[in-house]
């Protein structure tokens, strides 16, 4: 089943590998997070922003650096950047500009990247972490955000080992990014993990970005220093495990240099899977030649823009989690966190709760358990990609209500869910049609005496063929009766409630004692 468990870090441990901060070498760490924006078009052209298409199929003249082509700012990218900035409590700047960062690399055909070095779109934000929601050991921790800036993504460089060629794909060139730069406020890995997870959840919730590390939609750089010394940047870390390993490696590298009386040089390093490796000196050097971009106008925003965007924002994740663990939902915290990280499931839950609890008056625990344990669990059990549209909330709600009204056994209901998950073609059938198709309806048109006789016949048959289980039950292992009940439910295709079989088995087994 999809796991809802969290890693629990001890107060001194920084990551699962046992990385501890040496009190003699105080760690200071900041993050630079590059986030691809979910826009239809690229940042400065009308090419599609889908960079996973066939190589070089979504490339305009501007994207490939053709001389004479001019940029035109995509307003959707600006809006998504502003949404993120406001949600992160940032000061949106009424005046911002674009600058050119010059460097030569094959995946940057213009010879420069358009970014916002001098006047970014937002400054001075923050994100609050707390021990209740964010798996940190401290009661609370504020991570300050220095700035948020809009910039272009680069193309992709791929080495073809068969053709022995370096191939350039410019589909990703000029895809809009925001770069978030934090202050060096992180003191351990648990804080870093918590911040990244919370940020991922936020941008997904706002529909600003897919939030995926694996696909490169979010890419992270570490800035690491010890005892207030020079800052070293570690580039392009694509997972939490890489972050933890790279931080541990760089922290110990700087400690070793300090112990041997060597200076820690301000530079950019990469991660090769085992250690950080030098790439280049830091960008404070003059070779980047930052200059204002003369082809793009200044961005002048109305001072009221922040309030207007804030008013249009949906409830943010922490507020929703607080609502979900309170009346009337009363979800467990781990389930609330899971729902907030999966917006489609959250909306599904709201609809299901309305149908089962508000409209039908059933217990809230029933709706919670059937969605989390039975429906989502069925997808995991049968290794089917999670697609809750196969079983709309109206259909699951009907199943839950029938079980609650004793019109359908729990076993039959689970069987129906399993079939809906495994057989997408059944999606169009009604619940009654599904019950008839799989013959899982409760036994009808039978007297109580006839039902009792049929149940006893099944139980007697099962007992006769499972004497070893009976021996376990009578010698002090009463839970073994569940095995017999399971056999009986299977024998009757789930048409009789399990408690009926349980009572009959206990009655018959009592004669053995």
From Swiss-Prot:
Location in or out of the cell: Mitochondrion
SUPFAM superfamilies noted in UniProt: GatB/YqeY motif, Glutamine synthetase/guanido kinase
E.C. code: 6.3.5.-
Superkingdom of source: Eukaryota
GO biological-process terms attached to the record: glutaminyl-tRNAGln biosynthesis via transamidation; mitochondrial translation
InterPro entries, A to Z: Asn/Gln-tRNA_amidoTrfase_suB/E, Asn/Gln-tRNA_Trfase_suB/E_cat, Asn/Gln_amidotransferase, Asn/Gln_tRNA_amidoTrase-B-like, GatB, GatB_Yqey_C_2, Gln-tRNA_amidoTrfase_suB_CS, Gln_synth/guanido_kin_cat_dom
Main location: mitochondrion
Catalytic reactions on record: L-glutamyl-tRNA(Gln) + L-glutamine + ATP + H2O = L-glutaminyl-tRNA(Gln) + L-glutamate + ADP + phosphate + H(+)
Keyword annotations from UniProtKB, A to Z: ATP-binding, Ligase, Mitochondrion, Nucleotide-binding, Protein biosynthesis
Molecular function GO labels: ATP binding; glutaminyl-tRNA synthase (glutamine-hydrolyzing) activity
Any one of the GO CC terms: glutamyl-tRNA(Gln) amidotransferase complex
Other facts noted in the record for this chain: This protein may be expected to contain an N-terminal transit peptide but none has been predicted.
Family: Belongs to the GatB/GatE family. GatB subfamily.
Matching PANTHER family: GLUTAMYL-TRNA GLN AMIDOTRANSFERASE SUBUNIT B MITOCHONDRIAL AND PROKARYOTIC PET112-RELATED (PTHR11659), GLUTAMYL-TRNA(GLN) AMIDOTRANSFERASE SUBUNIT B, MITOCHONDRIAL (PTHR11659:SF0)
The protein's assembly and partners: Subunit of the heterotrimeric GatFAB amidotransferase (AdT) complex, composed of A, B and F subunits.
Described function: Allows the formation of correctly charged Gln-tRNA(Gln) through the transamidation of misacylated Glu-tRNA(Gln) in the mitochondria. The reaction takes place in the presence of glutamine and ATP through an activated gamma-phospho-Glu-tRNA(Gln).
Designated name of the protein: Glutamyl-tRNA(Gln) amidotransferase subunit B, mitochondrial
Native organism: Debaryomyces hansenii (strain ATCC 36239 / CBS 767 / BCRC 21394 / JCM 1990 / NBRC 0083 / IGC 2968)
Organism lineage string: Eukaryota, Fungi, Dikarya, Ascomycota, Saccharomycotina
Gene that specifies this protein: PET112
